[in-house]
């Protein structure tokens, strides 16, 4: 059965680089050390995951559709260090050195590309493993899709979602629609925090059911808040939901692992 390993490239690289940058190295030395650690990490992932296909997905220099509909999207995030951004080509080469192809789009966010890749292979009954610390991918969890937090050595699975949020993976988008995601500067419903969001979704099941309930005369205080800020909740829902239908322009044969000899490609 095919097993696709998807590496959230910048999520991995930025954390590896941050460790080196704390070692009082020069920027050039930190980049060299990051490259060496990236190769070592990549080889560990390939050995441990035993994939039949693999790809590393990068964010490009894009002005995403989310920024178009919500200009404050991701405002306030710490920018990538200049020396790291300027050295991304050599880090991309490090993936290729390990036999891992890289995907970089100038029109789509890496998160949406990863969601499309994982969902596409899952629809055909095959498996996908996403390497990332980004909990946003937990909305994709199903028997065919798993998420591995390499740095904390844990699986971000349904049990993790239940423990962390008190909901099932299919409810996460609606959970974040209510609470917002501070790391992406996405606002939810003022006055509805994680505990209340969990209680509401455990009782009503979904945001659509909550929106129907909040129109009732006997609506509770949290539901009245939702009624007042329902447009914000719907916008947040749209922003946090990953796209799963982006045209990719390549097929699985092109990202086989180990790579096919050029004569067979």
Swiss-Prot record:
Residues at which Mg(2+) binds: 111
Keyword ATP-binding attached: no
Q: How is the cofactor bound?
A: Binds 2 Mg(2+) per subunit. Only one magnesium ion has a direct interaction with the protein, the other interactions are indirect. Binds 1 K(+) per subunit. The potassium ion strongly increases the affinity for DNA.
Q: Name one GO molecular function term.
A: DNA binding
* Region (Interaction with DNA) location: 191-196
Q: Which domain of life is it from?
A: Bacteria
One of the protein's GO biological processes:
DNA replication, Okazaki fragment processing
InterPro entries in the cross-refs:
5-3_exonucl_a-hlix_arch_N (IPR020046), 5-3_exonuclease (IPR002421), 5-3_exonuclease_C_sf (IPR036279), DNA_polI_H3TH (IPR020045), FEN (IPR038969), HhH2 (IPR008918), PIN-like_dom_sf (IPR029060), Xni (IPR022895)
Residue intervals of the 5'-3' exonuclease domain: 167-260
- Please name every pair of cysteines joined by a disulfide bond in this record: none
Q: Which UniProt keywords apply?
A: DNA-binding, Endonuclease, Hydrolase, Magnesium, Metal-binding, Nuclease, Potassium
In the Enzyme Commission scheme, what number(s) does this protein have? 3.1.-.-
State the PANTHER family in the record: 5'-3' EXONUCLEASE FAMILY PROTEIN, FLAP ENDONUCLEASE XNI
Function in brief:
Has flap endonuclease activity. During DNA replication, flap endonucleases cleave the 5'-overhanging flap structure that is generated by displacement synthesis when DNA polymerase encounters the 5'-end of a downstream Okazaki fragment.
The family classification in the record reads: Belongs to the Xni family.
Listed name of the protein:
Flap endonuclease Xni
